[in-house]
Amino acid sequence: MLFEFNVVDIANMKTLLTHRLSQSEIKQLCALTQGEHNDNLKEELYQLTLDANRRVAINALWTFTHFAADDNVWLFAKHDQLIDRCLKEHDTTKLRLILTLLLRQPFDEEAIRTDFIDFCFARITDARAPYAIRAQCIKLAYEQMRYWPELLDELRQTLEMISCEPLSPGLRSAWRQVMRKL
């Protein structure tokens, strides 16, 4: 079901997000919110990521994962808020999508959060955590720790430790990618 949007008809955004989205609908939402002149619509979409309706929140997060690089820059201002959400999120789908958004953001040496590094380490070593989340946390741990050789040594030791367990192809790929950089 395709929705036609215009600036005064933004209420349809939440309605659209209540059902399974097609690729065409995702593209429509991205087009609706693209450009700096639509930052207010990006903010509305972001607020829908916090919606009590799980489907709405997940679809809003999923839409952000499809943003073009130029529009993704808008999310950089939400960096700490996204990290805070990761630390508290219990829904694995929402967590995976938030981690995906964080993977598309820069991690500066001055703005590193040790609580998020600890979060990533806890997920990397948790054999019960979903493979996708573990793989994302491997990459995010590297992005945060790459400025400090002593932290990279700790990451290398952790990755060597988990290499003894059976790893999914996706987790093995993330492991290999980061080990090559170490």
Label every PLM stretch briefly.
Residues 3-182:
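Alpha-helical scaffold domains
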